[in-house]
From Swiss-Prot:
Belongs to the RNase HII family. RnhC subfamily. The lineage of its organism: Bacteria, Bacillati, Bacillota, Bacilli, Bacillales. Its cofactor is Mn(2+); Mg(2+). This is Ribonuclease HIII. It is an enzyme of class 3 (hydrolase). Its EC number is 3.1.26.4. The gene is rnhC.
Length: 301
């Protein structure tokens, strides 16, 4: 199916909505302003200003609006990986005292890139929790994905055994990627892109004793969400699952658990200690963080 994307101003979006008024459907994907279905073409306009034309008449339909738009965006020089059908992986939770570590792997094929980009998919750190909750469910239905959740008790066990956090992340990334590669089979991704947290050589050194290691076409890039949209998609999925886990843990302990590792977290942990005793932190926190000692001191006051 042919895809074509143009960028529209707010005025132009309103003109398009009026033009396609008789063709507008009721179902809206995440981030969309309207969807119109015409013979040979589906038009999806997004809040980002992107308008996606899909179908055999996509180019012809988009051409009607090209003079009013910014014209085709000048092609930006990109690394070859940016155009590949690829798996991206990213993690969330390693800097948060409360909650698990979540790694997500997501696969975006070439013919899905325009649709995913038009949705406004970008690094989850640039999006609010509300935006994550709005975008992620649709995204997870659109593309193959896998997540791995490392619970707090397991994280604490691994950390007490002397395992560095970088190795923990390497194990989780490899597991999530491996699950997705298996799900995709017989399709083979052209690239597997990890949001870099260590050098590639050290990443594989951490995995040398593992039985199942995904090695082919693996790349590690800093700010990898700018290299391929699959990494941005993975970051959104990982954060969405992390938010769900935080909600679940909050219900279990009877109070809202804050994100991060600041003073607000110290106070929350101290309240948990006072209410339930220090053992409660084992099941909802990363105990090696300095917050544990700070909370213990506050709880004694």
């Amino acid at each position: 199916m042919a895809n074509h994307v143009i960028t529209a101003t707010a005025t132009m979006l309103e003109e398009m909505r009026n033009h396609y008024a008789s063709d507008i459907t009721g179902h809206l994907p995440a981030g969309a302003l309207f969807v119109a279905k015409r013979s040979g073409c589906t038009i999806t306009a997004y809040r980002t200003g992107k308008v996606l034309f899909q179908g055999k008449e996509a180019e012809q339909e988009a051409a009607k609006w090209m003079k009013e738009s910014d014209q085709k965006e000048a092609p930006v020089p990109q690394p070859p990986l940016a155009a590949a059908s690829a798996i991206g992986s990213d993690e969330v939770g390693t800097g948060d005292y409360f909650g698990p570590v979540v790694v997500a792997a997501a696969y975006v094929a070439k013919d899905q890139m325009d649709a995913i980009t038009a949705m406004g998919i970008k690094d989850s750190k640039l999006l609010t929790d509300e935006a994550i909750r709005r975008l992620a469910p649709s995204l997870m239905n659109m593309i193959p994905n896998q997540t791995v959740i490392l619970s707090n008790p397991m994280y604490n066990d691994w950390q007490r055994s002397g395992m560095p956090q970088t190795k923990i992340k390497a194990l989780l990334h490899n597991e999530a990627i491996g699950k997705l590669v298996k799900q995709l089979s017989p399709i083979e991704p052209e690239a597997i892109i990890i949001d870099q947290f260590i050098e590639r050589d050290l990443y594989f050194r951490y995995l040398e004793n593992e039985t199942n290691v995904v090695r082919d076409h693996v790349y590690c890039y800093p700010k990898a969400e700018t290299v391929h949209v699959a990494v941005a998609a993975a970051s959104i999925i990982a954060r969405y699952v992390f938010l769900q886990e935080m909600e679940r843990l909050s219900k279990e302990v009877g109070m809202t658990l804050p994100k991060g590792a600041g003073a607000q977290v110290d106070q929350a942990a101290a309240k948990l200690i006072q209410t339930h005793g220090p053992a409660i932190l084992e099941m909802c926190a990363k105990l090696h963080f300095a917050n544990t000692e700070k909370a213990a001191r506050i709880a004694k006051k």
